[in-house]
A protein has these predicted regions:
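Charged, flexible boundary elements
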Residues: 1-8
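Aspartic protease
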Residues: 9-94
Length: 94
C-alpha cells in the first residue's frame, strides 16, 4: 500500500503532497506564498502547532484547478486535506 503522493502546483510552485482524507486542512512546509496571512493553531500528531493561514491560493492538482485556503507551517509531509479534496470532488476509497 503506497501513500497517494501527487505533484501539485501551489501559487505557481511545484510541490509533492500527500492526499490525506484524515486531515481537515491543507498544510505545506517551506513554501513562500504572496499576500496576507493570519495566524492559526491546528492540532497535529505532536500536539498543537502554529501555522500561517493564506486565503484564496490557486492550486492545481492533476490538471484540476481550485482556489482555497492553505496553511504553512511545520509538518512531517505536505498534505492535501479534505477541504481541497471536497472542492475537487475527489474521494479516496480504500
Amino acid at each position: 500500500w503506497q501513500r497517494p503522493l501527487v505533484t501539485v502546483k501551489i501559487g505557481g510552485q511545484l510541490k509533492e503532497a500527500l492526499l490525506d482524507t484524515g486531515a481537515d486542512n491543507t498544510v505545506f512546509e517551506d513554501i513562500n506564498l504572496p499576500g496576507r496571512w493570519k495566524p492559526k493553531m491546528i492540532g497535529g500528531i505532536g500536539g498543537f502547532v502554529k501555522v500561517r493561514q493564506y486565503e484564496q491560493i490557486p492550486i492545481e492538482i492533476c490538471g484540476h484547478k481550485v482556489i482555497g485556503t492553505v496553511l504553512i507551517g511545520p509538518t512531517p509531509a505536505n498534505i492535501i486535506g479534505r477541504d481541497l479534496m471536497t472542492q475537487l470532488g475527489c474521494t479516496l476509497n480504500f
